[in-house]
A protein has these predicted regions:
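Active-site neighborhoods of metal-dependent hydrolases
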Residues: 139-143, 149-151, 155-168, 173-181, ...
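Histidine-rich, glycine-flanked metal-binding segment
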Residues: 2-8, 15-62
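Divalent metal-coordination and catalytic microenvironments
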Residues: 13, 33, 56, 67, ...
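C-terminal amphipathic alpha-helical interaction region
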Residues: 464, 477-492
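Divalent-metal coordination cores built from histidine and acidic residues
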Residues: 76-186, 191, 195-199, 239
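Di-metal (Zn2+ and/or Mg2+/Mn2+) metal-binding site signature of metallo-dependent hydrolases
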Residues: 58-80
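Active-site His/acidic residue clusters
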Residues: 212-215
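Short, ordered loop/turn segments at secondary-structure junctions
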Residues: 41, 96-98, 205, 449
């Protein structure tokens, strides 16, 4: 029987090692899942049972996704094929304060399903069957036994910790945790880091709401925490050199200053911070400048280790009927989202008084968050009335003598979730997106794989980045080299 030196040989590819060094033609030998030989000359065909000719192709390290929501999917389907087939070989879960480590199965489901737009009826049975662990060591042990597709890492979610200590109802109320409860939270964070979690994720934007019957439509538990609670946990992250992944208030935004200060490294070790998110938003065209400037201040003046996550793609969402998470940004929209009964929700938008209030809030200048609230930039992509496909709600309303909001509501009432439409929140200007991607104060993330399954699909984000890099170079407008692009989705994230 023939003895092979390698499992796989890849010859003649342009090899990028993940650093910012330019690629060069190299020949790779892989054994037991690791690159063991990088040769200047081709490796022989008889050295491995699988030999690939990569002439004219790039050979790179596996890509890393630092912001996914595969927490439920990986329990049921650990292969995560959709990411792996796009070259992603390492994935982090536990983002946005939500992990499935410490809390009870129903608590974990209620924290996760509405926020990440994954059906509760799919997630809860999986957790009830599979979640036999109650702590980080058990969580780690579960994954050690799974046939994982990519490498897996996790944050521990602050909402998960809070619910495990205080219970769901108290954790989603103004109740202050006792000293004993704060000490227990600290202990759970230490245990998570001991088990291999990379850090803790938290949330301060109150747009994401809890599912289920017990705390329906309350903001995530992490949003109820006071800064004293955060600071106690931050001290542990700083001492352990672990990562804090956080999100400032998406509407008010001012609390980002507190995050900047917490990250500082003046006369102490800086806390590693990965913050959501640096986008070129239509609702705030200058926000991209503010995020880059804040990164400069945090890292240069405050000596921090602070990065904004940014997305290498237009931030376009596909939506159904009235199922619009951005409605949480203003009170009348929040009222709609609070309805658990779909019939009652659709009946509400038939109320003229409600429509008047909704239009007032849509046109308000000082409460805009992520969404631009421009219904002339909301386009029908599928509808039983096929004549509407490709038109925006303002165009549809003009034909019928209605304004855009009335046109939208009337169609939503008539067709409900059969009305599919899309809108772009941001990253619509390639030249600004390029600046965000090239900034030393951002890193590539925010793909949200495993969540919002009917709205977004950014599984291929590393490949999109590399295509933007190549296209810009071919157009004579380079914003980073191919080697820097590979670095941005590999070593820079590691």
């Amino acid at each position: 029987m023939q003895q092979y030196v390698y499992d796989i040989v890849i010859n003649h590819g342009q090899f990028f090692d993940g650093s910012c060094r330019d690629g060069s033609i190299r020949h790779l030998g892989i054994r037991d899942g690791r690159v063991v030989t990088i040769s200047d000359v081709p490796l022989p065909d008889h050295a491995a049972p699988k030999v690939y000719d990569a002439t004219g192709q790039w050979v790179t390290p596996g890509f890393i996704e630092t912001h996914s929501h595969y927490d439920a999917e990986v329990i049921a389907t650990p292969s995560l094929k959709e990411s792996v087939r796009h070259g992603v070989t390492s994935v982090l879960i536990g983002s946005c304060s939500i992990s499935m480590i410490n809390a009870q199965p129903e608590d974990c489901s209620d924290l996760f399903t509405r926020v990440e737009a994954v059906p509760r009826e799919a997630v809860l049975p999986i957790l009830k069957e599979k979640k036999t662990w109650r702590d980080a060591a058990g969580y780690r042990g579960f994954y050690d036994r799974q046939p994982l597709g990519p490498n897996m890492g996790s944050f521990v979610g602050h909402s998960d910790i809070r619910v495990a200590v205080m219970g769901l109802e108290r954790a989603t109320s103004p109740a202050k945790p006792s000293e004993q409860e704060l000490q227990k939270m600290e202990s759970l964070l230490e245990e998570a880091l001991d088990a291999g979690c990379v850090g803790m994720s938290l949330m301060t934007t109150r747009l994401d709401k809890v599912d289920g019957d017990r705390a329906w439509s309350r903001p995530l538990p992490s949003t109820y925490a006071r800064w004293n609670e955060f600071k106690r946990l931050f001290r542990i992250l700083r001492r352990r050199n672990a990562v804090m992944q956080g999100a400032p208030d998406a509407v008010k935004k001012v609390n980002v200053v507190r995050f900047l200060w917490q990250a500082h490294g003046l006369f102490r070790r800086p806390m590693k911070c990965s913050m959501l998110t640096a986008l070129d938003l239509k609702s705030n065209p200058w926000l991209n400048v503010v995020t880059r400037l804040s990164g400069f201040v945090a890292n240069r003046f405050l000596r921090g280790n602070f990065r904004w996550q940014t997305l290498p793609a237009p931030f376009t969402l596909y939506l159904s009927g009235l199922n619009v998470n951005a409605f949480e940004e203003f009170s009348s929209g929040e009222l709609l989202r609070d309805y658990k009964d779909e019939d009652a929700m659709y009946a509400k938008v038939d109320d003229p008084a409600f429509r008047k209030l909704f239009k007032k809030h849509v046109n308000a200048l000082f409460t805009k968050g992520l969404w631009h609230r421009d219904f002339s930039d909301c386009w029908v992509v599928d509808c039983p009335d096929t004549s509407l496909i490709g038109k925006n709600f303002e165009e549809i309303g003009a034909v019928e003598g209605k304004d855009a909001v009335d046109a939208y509501f009337d169609l939503a009432v008539q067709y409900r979730n059969d009305l599919r439409w899309k809108t772009n929140y941001g990253n619509h200007r390639p030249e600004i997106m390029h600046k965000l991607l090239a900034s030393p104060y951002t890193h590539v993330g925010f793909a949200d794989s495993g969540a919002h399954l009917e709205s977004i699909a950014q599984y291929n984000f590393p490949l999109r980045l590399l295509k933007y890099v190549r296209d810009a170079d071919e157009a004579g407008l380079p914003f980073m080299s191919v080697a820097e692009g590979v670095n941005a989705v590999t070593a820079d994230l590691a």
